[in-house]
Amino acid sequence: MIEEFVEIEDTKHAGFAAAMEIYADAFPANTRFEVDLLRERIDKRLSCLYLGYLEDEVVFMALLWPLKNTEFILLDYIATKKNYRGQGIGTAFMNQINQMLSVINLC
C-alpha cells in the first residue's frame, strides 16, 4: 500500500516531473493545463500538488485549487500511475485529505 502522501511546494522537487508524467498519461491533452501554468500556480501557492509514494516511486498525483475568499477547495486533477490503478491509492488519499481538512488549513 501507499507509503505516504506529501505536498510538493517547489516544482524543482524531483517528484514534480514524475507527477507531470502521470498527469499527461491520465488526461487527454485538450483537458490539461500547460505544465508551465501548473508550475507557476504551484510555485505561487495558488494550487497544491500532492504526490503519493510507493517504494520511493511517485505513483499518484493530485492537484488541489483552494478557491479564493471561500472555504472551498477544488480537487482539480487526481490520477494514479497506470500500473497501480485499482489498488485503493486514490481512496487512501481522499481519506487522508478528509482527515487533514478537519484539523489544518490545507494549502
Which residues fall in each region the model found?
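Active-site rim helix/loop that mediates acceptor-substrate recognition in acyltransferases
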Residues: 26-55, 63
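Conserved GNAT acetyl-CoA-binding A-motif
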Residues: 99-107
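Short amphipathic alpha-helix that is part of the acyltransferase structural core
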Residues: 1-36
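Conserved beta-strand in the GNAT
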Residues: 51, 56-66, 72-79
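Residue-level detection of beta-strand scaffold positions
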Residues: 3-5, 60, 75, 93
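N-terminal, well-ordered alpha-helical segments
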Residues: 21, 73-76, 95
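Sequence-level motif detector for i,i+2 pairs with an aromatic at +2
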Residues: 1-3, 47, 59, 70
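Conserved acetyl-CoA-binding loop-helix of GNAT-fold acetyltransferases
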Residues: 80, 86-99
